[in-house]
């Protein structure tokens, strides 16, 4: 029998999910995206060649894998075609490997315009969105006025629905945000120009997954962003607009939650965050600079510099709790090479002097807390490219063991570099 494995981020995104998905897909028949949109940035390095994917599942580079985009993903037609063109230029037959739910909400130019206009209007209270229209597209979905992939396939009906929604959003753009309206005719023409191409790749994703399960195939569900950016469980309001947690798998592609066998939580050996929002262990010193420089901490989607800090076991408590994490994949262990002392945040100290080990539920709760650290010795030896725990420095092994002890979750996979071969697999989730 096959296994259904969920790969998701347990921090604020950028944990290295793309590499791990690509690595493990040699055991999977299907790779499924179930939430988010082209705000994701999954970087794959294979034989030294880097590929950055934003929308298409990371398994697309494997010729034995079918890639599915579930209904929980908001889909930008322009971004999809750009990514297809990029991959085809590399010789990847994307259209043979990709299937898309016709229930995916569409991201159209007015969503981008709204996203950018709102961030500008917020000023120094900006959330730090990618400006790619993700949030406004999810808003339209919840308000039941959004257009979906399936709407593209009837031009007359699509045109009528589009006209109504463009007028609705243009009113806000012009009268409230004082920016230029989007052009209805241009939006219509651009959308219909790719309708036939997209139609050839649409399918009933829920049915495909159910039949695959019955046939005993192995399926991987690829998360985007990270748990602490979840719309419900993250550091609200500094969050994304979808459910990035394991529960999003069931709703985002129509698979029953009872059929999920293993939840692999991807976590860096330290912590990073892009954009605004609470970050208790953030470092503004030489160590923070070391993590950012050695770890190449720049967003794959936006190019923005990531904020860096120590491993936060308190925030991780929430991620483990809401995801039922089975095992960790600890990434970027090699970035810690050369640091004399390492720290793990094991608690937050409140203004009253109490130590809490469960994080606040909203951003405001972080305003008056300070991290409590446990110190450990670092190591001078290189871990870059290690493929066996036997070659890891003693202090690196002690650091990993301490993370396991504090969190209660085993570290089943360790990443020691960007290439898929630079990995230590102690336990393969599919075996």
Curated annotation (Swiss-Prot):
Q: Which Pfam families match?
A: Adenylsucc_synt
> Where does the record say this protein resides?
Cytoplasm
What EC number is given for this enzyme?
Answer: 6.3.4.4
Q: SMART domains under this entry?
A: Adenylsucc_synt
Q: Name one GO molecular function term.
A: GTP binding
Please give the PROSITE patterns that the UniProt record associates with this protein: ADENYLOSUCCIN_SYN_1, ADENYLOSUCCIN_SYN_2
Name what cofactor the protein needs: Mg(2+)
Q: Which residues bind Mg(2+)?
A: 14, 41
Residues in the active site? 14 (proton acceptor), 42 (proton donor)
Q: Which domain of life is it from?
A: Bacteria
Question: What InterPro entries does the entry give?
Answer: Adenylosuccin_syn_GTP-bd (IPR018220), Adenylosuccin_syn_Lys_AS (IPR033128), Adenylosuccinate_synth_dom1 (IPR042109), Adenylosuccinate_synth_dom2 (IPR042110), Adenylosuccinate_synth_dom3 (IPR042111), Adenylosuccinate_synthetase (IPR001114), P-loop_NTPase (IPR027417)
Q: Name one GO cellular component term.
A: cytoplasm
Q: Which residues bind substrate?
A: 300-306
What detail does the entry give on cofactor binding? Binds 1 Mg(2+) ion per subunit.
Q: In which pathway does it act?
A: Purine metabolism; AMP biosynthesis via de novo pathway; AMP from IMP: step 1/2
Q: Which UniProt keywords apply?
A: Cytoplasm, GTP-binding, Ligase, Magnesium, Metal-binding, Nucleotide-binding, Purine biosynthesis
Q: What assembly does the database describe for this protein?
A: Homodimer.
Q: Which family does it belong to?
A: Belongs to the adenylosuccinate synthetase family.
What's this chain's function? Plays an important role in the de novo pathway of purine nucleotide biosynthesis. Catalyzes the first committed step in the biosynthesis of AMP from IMP.
Annotated protein name in UniProt = Adenylosuccinate synthetase
Q: Which organism is it from?
A: Colwellia psychrerythraea (strain 34H / ATCC BAA-681) (Vibrio psychroerythus)
Lineage runs: Bacteria, Pseudomonadati, Pseudomonadota, Gammaproteobacteria, Alteromonadales
């Amino acid at each position: 029998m096959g296994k259904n494995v969920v790969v998701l981020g347990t921090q604020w995104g950028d944990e290295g999910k793309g590499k791990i998905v690509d690595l493990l897909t040699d055991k999977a028949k299907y790779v499924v995206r179930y939430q988010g949109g082209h705000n994701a940035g999954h970087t794959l390095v294979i034989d030294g060649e880097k590929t950055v994917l934003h929308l298409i599942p990371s398994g697309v580079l494997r010729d034995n894998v079918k890639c599915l985009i579930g209904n929980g993903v908001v889909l930008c037609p322009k971004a999809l075609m750009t990514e297809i063109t990029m991959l085809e230029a590399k010789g990847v037959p994307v259209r043979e490997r990709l299937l898309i739910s016709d229930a995916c909400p569409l991201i159209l130019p007015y969503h981008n315009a709204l996203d950018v206009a709102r961030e500008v209007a917020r000023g120094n209270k900006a959330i730090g969105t990618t400006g790619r229209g993700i949030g406004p597209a999810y808003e339209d979905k919840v308000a039941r006025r959004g257009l979906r992939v399936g709407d593209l396939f009837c031009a007359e009906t699509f045109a009528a629905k589009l006209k109504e929604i463009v007028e609705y959003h243009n009113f806000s753009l012009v009268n409230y945000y004082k920016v230029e309206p989007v052009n209805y005719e241009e939006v219509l023409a651009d959308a219909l120009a790719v309708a036939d191409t997209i139609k050839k790749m649409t399918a009933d994703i829920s049915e495909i997954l159910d039949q695959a399960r019955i046939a005993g195939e192995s399926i991987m569900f690829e998360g985007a962003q990270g748990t602490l950016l979840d719309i419900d469980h993250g550091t609200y309001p500094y969050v994304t607009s979808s459910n990035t947690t394991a529960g999003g798998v069931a709703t985002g592609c129509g698979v029953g939650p009872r059929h999920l066998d293993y939840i692999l939580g991807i976590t860096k050996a330290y912590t990073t965050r892009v954009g605004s929002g609470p970050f208790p262990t953030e470092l503004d010193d030489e160590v923070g600079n070391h993590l950012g420089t050695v770890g190449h901490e720049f967003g794959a989607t936006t190019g923005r510099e990531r904020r860096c800090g120590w491993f936060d076991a308190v925030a991780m408590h929430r991620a483990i709790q809401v995801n039922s994490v089975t095992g960790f994949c600890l990434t970027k262990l090699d970035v810690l090479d050369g640091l004399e002392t390492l720290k793990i945040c094991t608690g937050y100290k409140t203004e009253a002097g109490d130590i809490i080990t469960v994080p606040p539920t909203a951003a405001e709760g972080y305003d008056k807390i300070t991290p409590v650290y446990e110190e450990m010795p670092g190591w001078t030896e290189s871990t870059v490219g290690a493929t066996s725990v036997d070659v890891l420095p003693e202090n690196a092994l002690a650091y990993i063991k301490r993370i396991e002890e504090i969190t209660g979750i085993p570290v089943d996979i360790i990443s020691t570099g960007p290439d898929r071969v630079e990995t230590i697999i102690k336990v393969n989730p599919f075996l």
